Structures are given as structure tokens and as C-alpha cells.
């Protein structure tokens, strides 16, 4: 209803607490940045869905993070804070992200830009859930049963599939929605 609580960078725990403490807020999508986690925690106790899209070198050397494993450990706190009946969404194309799966104590959904990703295929063959690209379309699957969610051509943010980082974000968001039901 056009109610703005705060403008600007709202990726930290203070912003999350402000947002979640507002009685008008019924649901929230929060970006939880590495620096904010280190300085003030997550800003919430438990979530219904936790998503880790990637782990990259862009923040190494900051806040005592010397290698990708340090950064992965910090980001894994997002998974540990998912409610047991909730869902963790992980990028099957990023081996370091995928290696965090044991830290999740909830249902897992993998996403991948590649329909033949080995981890994704194994997870689906075991009855798991996943979201992937197939023939220029976003597909959501449970076990061996999949359904087309949307063609990439209908998503301008992906530049017709050329902006791979945004395609990956679409897959992650689709997986999060699948996780919510």
C-alpha cells in the first residue's frame, strides 16, 4: 500500500529487524549480505526459505575472510537458520555452494543453468526437487516429473537468456517459490 519503511542499502540485519518488526509486514524477501552477517547476524531467527546463489572472490580479504571456504562458512549461516519444515535453495552449478547441503536441516531444492547437471539429476532421481533450463524454458521438477514455468523469452530481465547471472537469479527465485508451495 505504498508504505516505504526505509530507502537505500537494506541488506543488513538492522534493516531486516526493522522490516520484520513492522506490523504491516506479512512476508519479506531479504538479501543477507556477508558484511552484515559478520557485524550483526542475520537479523531474524528462522526463515521459511534460505537461498544461496553463489560464492565468489569479490569480498575476499575483507572482514577476515581469506579464502572461499571462509566465505562459504559465513553464507552457510543462512541455511542453518531455515525452519526444519522449510526449504534450502542451492546452486548446483557452484560446487562450493552445493557442498553446503549438509549444513541445511530441511528440504533441499537445487537450481541449475544446465538440465544435465549431475548433482541436480541425482537429486531428482532420488525424488528431490529442482529448477533448471530446458530448451530456453524454466522448468520446475519433483522427481522425474517436470513442468514448464515460463519461457526465458517472456523474461526481459534475462535479455532473452543472454544475461546468465539474471537467468540464474530467476531459477533461484523460482526454486524459492516452489519451496514455499
Regions found by a protein language model. Name each.
Residues 1:
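A conserved segment at the C-terminal end of the G1
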Residues 4-123, 154-160:
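Flexible active-site lid/hinge loop adjacent to a nucleotide/diphosphate
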Residues 14, 169-175:
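Short amphipathic alpha-helical face segments that pack within enzyme cores
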Residues 74, 92, 165-171:
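A generic structural signal for residues located within well-ordered alpha-helices
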Residues 110-134, 144, 165-166:
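C-terminal accessory "lid"/substrate-recognition subdomains
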Residues 130-154:
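Acidic-glycine-rich active-site phosphate/pyrophosphate-binding loop
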Residues 160-165, 175-181:
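Gly/charged, well-structured mid-domain segments that form the phosphate/adenylate-handling core
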Amino acid at each position: 500500500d505504498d508504505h516505504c519503511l526505509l530507502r537505500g542499502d537494506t541488506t543488513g540485519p538492522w534493516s531486516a529487524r526493522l522490516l520484520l518488526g513492522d506490523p504491516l509486514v506479512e512476508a519479506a524477501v531479504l538479501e543477507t549480505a556477508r558484511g552484515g552477517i559478520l557485524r550483526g547476524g542475520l537479523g531474524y531467527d528462522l526463515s521459511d526459505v534460505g537461498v544461496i546463489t553463489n560464492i565468489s572472490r569479490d569480498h575476499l580479504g575483507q572482514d577476515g575472510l581469506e579464502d572461499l571456504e571462509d566465505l562459504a562458512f559465513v553464507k552457510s549461516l543462512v541455511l542453518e537458520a531455515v525452519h526444519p519444515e522449510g526449504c534450502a535453495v542451492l546452486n548446483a552449478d557452484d560446487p562450493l555452494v552445493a557442498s553446503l547441503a549438509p549444513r541445511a536441516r530441511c528440504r533441499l531444492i537445487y537450481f541449475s543453468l544446465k538440465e544435465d547437471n549431475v548433482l541436480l539429476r541425482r537429486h531428482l532421481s532420488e525424488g528431490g526437487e529442482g529448477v533448471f533450463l530446458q530448451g530456453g524454458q524454466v522448468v520446475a521438477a519433483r522427481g522425474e516429473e517436470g513442468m514448464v514455468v515460463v519461457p526465458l523469452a517472456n523474461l526481459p530481465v534475462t535479455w532473452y537468456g543472454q544475461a546468465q547471472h539474471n537467468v540464474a537469479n530467476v531459477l533461484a527465485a523460482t526454486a524459492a517459490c516452489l519451496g514455499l508451495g
